[in-house]
Amino acid sequence: MEKKKVVLAYSGGLDTSVAIKWLQEKNYDIIALCLDLGEGKDLAFVKEKALSVGAIKSYMIDVQEEFANEYALMAMQAHTLYEGKYPLVSALSRPLIAKKLVEIAEQEGATAVAHGCTGKGNDQVRFEVSIQALNPYLEVIAPVREWKWSREEEIAYAKENNVPIPINLDSPFSIDQNLWGRSNECGILEDPWAAPPEDAYEMTLALEDTPNKPEFVEIGFEAGVPTTLNGTAYPLSELIKTLNALAGKHGVGRIDHVENRLVGIKSREVYECPAAMTLITAHKELEDLTLVKEVAHFKPMIEQKITELIYNGLWFSPLKQALHAFLQETQKNVTGMVRVKLFKGHAIVEGRKSEYSLYDEKLATYTAQDEFNHDAAVGFISLFGLPTKVYSQVNQKKVEA
């Protein structure tokens, strides 16, 4: 019987390594796919590990710049903070992983793709909805969801099948990281009353260990895109990683969040997003300077919907594409410089300037240079308040009657 091909999203961890053996038993040839999303680790060994475990082919693709420009950038411009806190670190990477799974599957003539998600997380939804949107004819296999093993049973299976056991298996935490940030759950973090231990963090310093002097950074934007940091031009992925180090040193971007998952449960996770939080803060301030009032007041409603769509795995939905078009239109004049003070866990904007600034000092000042027409206020107030005045007159007459 001829074996079918399946492309597996491979991380090098226990779950996806065991999945290779499990899929082999189901008569599949496995093609492993690992993506470098900017987690800051050497992933060459992951490619080789997949082959040693049993994959017939293994890909390791650097997608950092694609992730930065086509995924993280939109999240920054839309100020995506799920439930006001979470910058969608993991949610942003899933549609890109799904896209590459489909591309490799079509290239290799595979009939199926597979992922290592459990049956109680958001990621299974994000992967499978994205894959269905890109190629509805591919079979999607979720080994971890299907086998329903305990951790002990999974380890026993790995030992029986000579699957290497990761040296960090005794770590209580489940971690996902890319250049937009780091998420951490499980272990003591499952108790929402327990303070996160310091070893739960990697990208940021504790406030007690941060410098006692602030550091200032100037971020340059062109049409809504961060392009320079302290006067130096960077590709977006490098700018984000550089800012991660700068802001992380000052403890910026630590987030402790009890969130409402898509699958109906609450979970407690700890996030580190130093660059994401700094860029979102700076970008919002530049928009305040350059967007007209009507757009500035309407855009947050669109941002909320974009955030929900991304969190819920609907990156490739028609609505998300339509809202993205609106978002891009708003960014044409978001060009300028923002000065940010990094200090003791805070990214504080202390200055902003733009050639497209709608702030006119001669209209705003209270000095002798004031050019605002104060006499125009009388007529404006009369017309602006007229509906309220008429309503009051009518209802007072009824009361008197």
Swiss-Prot record:
Q: Which Pfam families match?
A: Arginosuc_syn_C, Arginosuc_synth
Keyword terms, alphabetized = Amino-acid biosynthesis, Arginine biosynthesis, ATP-binding, Cytoplasm, Ligase, Nucleotide-binding
Give Gene Ontology CC terms: cytoplasm
Q: What EC identifiers does the entry list?
A: 6.3.4.5
Q: What is its main location?
A: cytoplasm
Residues binding ATP are A9, Y10, S11, G12, G13, L14, D15, T16, S17, G116
Q: Which superkingdom does the taxonomy of this entry point to? A: Bacteria
Q: In which pathway does it act?
A: Amino-acid biosynthesis; L-arginine biosynthesis; L-arginine from L-ornithine and carbamoyl phosphate: step 2/3
Q: Where in the cell is it found?
A: Cytoplasm
Q: Which GO terms describe its biological process?
A: argininosuccinate metabolic process; L-arginine biosynthetic process; urea cycle
Q: Which Gene3D superfamilies match?
A: Argininosuccinate synthetase, chain A, domain 2, HUPs, Single helix bin
Q: Which reaction does it catalyse?
A: L-citrulline + L-aspartate + ATP = 2-(N(omega)-L-arginino)succinate + AMP + diphosphate + H(+)
Which intervals of the chain form a coiled coil? none
Residues that coordinate or bind L-citrulline: Y86, N122, R126, S174, S183, E259, Y271
- InterPro entries xref list: Arginosuc_syn_C, Arginosuc_syn_N, Arginosuc_synth, Arginosuc_synth_CS, Arginosuc_synth_type_1_subfam, AS_cat/multimer_dom_body, Rossmann-like_a/b/a_fold
Q: Please list the residues that bind L-aspartate.
A: T118, N122, D123
Q: Name one GO molecular function term.
A: ATP binding
Q: Give me the segments passing through the membrane.
A: none
Enzyme's top EC category: ligase
- Xref: PROSITE patterns: ARGININOSUCCIN_SYN_1, ARGININOSUCCIN_SYN_2
What's the family? Belongs to the argininosuccinate synthase family. Type 1 subfamily.
Question: What is said about its interaction partners and assembly?
Answer: Homotetramer.
Q: Which HAMAP family match?
A: Arg_succ_synth_type1
Q: What is this protein called?
A: Argininosuccinate synthase
Gene from which this protein is expressed: argG
